[in-house]
């Protein structure tokens, strides 16, 4: 066992934190990303715990906070993000100790629950070691864009092509690019929301998709001057697949949903393999009309009560924009 100590993040730790993230293959963290995610989140006190050994940082576990509708009430939900442990300190309880430290801090600032989307390795730790509970997972849907993409994925052949097209100001089919979100976007979300989900008001939407250092394309569907829906699309490469991803979609009627989905497809450059999404049950027909199909892949979802109340087990709605890595 290697000796280490734990402590809260201090500003002087930032460069060592970045170095650890890069060393474990998570190099997207830089000053701009850090300041946006941790310092400008409109609903988030900064919560980062570190493990130190021999004068360096060997472990990190952070949490972000999001205003969330839970059983019709607005609550503050804590979400673990940006976790890393130096190789020689793995399987020694570093992550578990940092995570429990964060859970205690989150409860102290008023978050009654915490949820996350674990990978295969962290799922066992969350559920078996830390007392989290499995919640209904979410199936990934995909709109294939290249005929050979599925076969190439099955064979493990990676793609580095595709991406987002150059930005265009063109309005087509009642859908136009959105520069920033106004109050009408938050009002639209409020009028259509069902189930348990993160609050999408004007401040959140602009922080998440406009002020971000990441590249997102935002579109609004209009009837005359009235906003009737909006969508956000981005691009990533995961497991060798060049994928567009639907970060968000809010539209009360199927016509606008389909129009927005088709515009998101058009925004992806040649070489992109697919556009992926998480699909609410009531939206499935619109996604089928836009060429999406359900895949075999499901995203794990786990949660834990921090105040002793029963954890809502069903009726959760998430989008890929709710993940810290999209």
Question: Could you tell me what each predicted segment is?
Answer:
Residues 85, 90-104, 254-267:
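Conserved acetyl-CoA-binding loop-helix of GNAT-fold acetyltransferases
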Residues 29, 39-50, 59, 127, ...:
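A short helix-loop-beta-strand connector motif used in the catalytic cores of GNAT acetyltransferases and
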């Amino acid at each position: 066992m290697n000796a280490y100590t734990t402590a809260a993040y201090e500003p002087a730790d930032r460069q060592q934190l970045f170095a650890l993230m890069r060393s474990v293959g998570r190099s997207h963290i830089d000053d701009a990303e850090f300041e946006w995610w941790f310092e400008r989140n409109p609903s988030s006190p900064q919560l980062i715990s570190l493990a130190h050994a021999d004068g360096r940082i060997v472990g990190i576990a952070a949490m972000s906070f999001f205003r969330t509708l839970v059983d019709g009430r607005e609550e503050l939900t804590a979400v673990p993000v940006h976790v890393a442990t130096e190789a020689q300190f793995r399987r020694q309880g570093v992550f578990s100790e940092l995570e429990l430290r964060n859970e205690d801090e989150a409860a102290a600032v008023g978050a009654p629950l915490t949820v996350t989307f674990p990978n295969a390795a962290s799922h066992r730790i969350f559920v078996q070691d830390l007392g989290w509970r499995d919640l209904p997972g979410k199936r990934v849907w995909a709109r294939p864009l290249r005929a050979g993409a599925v076969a190439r994925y099955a064979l493990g052949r990676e793609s580095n092509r595709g991406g987002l097209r150059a930005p265009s100001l063109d309005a087509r089919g009642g859908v136009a690019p959105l520069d920033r979100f106004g109050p009408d976007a938050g009002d639209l979300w409020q009028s259509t929301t069902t189930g348990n989900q993160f609050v999408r008001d004007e401040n959140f939407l602009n922080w998440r998709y406009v002020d971000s250092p990441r590249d997102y394309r935002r579109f609004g569907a209009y009837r005359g001057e009235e906003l009737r829906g909006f969508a956000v699309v981005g691009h990533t490469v995961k497991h060798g697949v060049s994928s567009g991803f639907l970060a968000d979609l809010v539209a009360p009627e199927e016509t606008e949903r389909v129009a927005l989905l088709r515009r998101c497809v058009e925004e992806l450059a040649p070489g992109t393999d697919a556009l992926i999404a998480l699909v609410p049950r009531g939206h499935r027909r619109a996604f089928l009309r836009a060429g999406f199909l359900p895949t075999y892949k499901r995203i794990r979802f786990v949660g834990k009560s921090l105040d002793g109340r029963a954890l809502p087990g069903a009726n959760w709605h998430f989008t890929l924009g709710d993940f810290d890595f999209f």
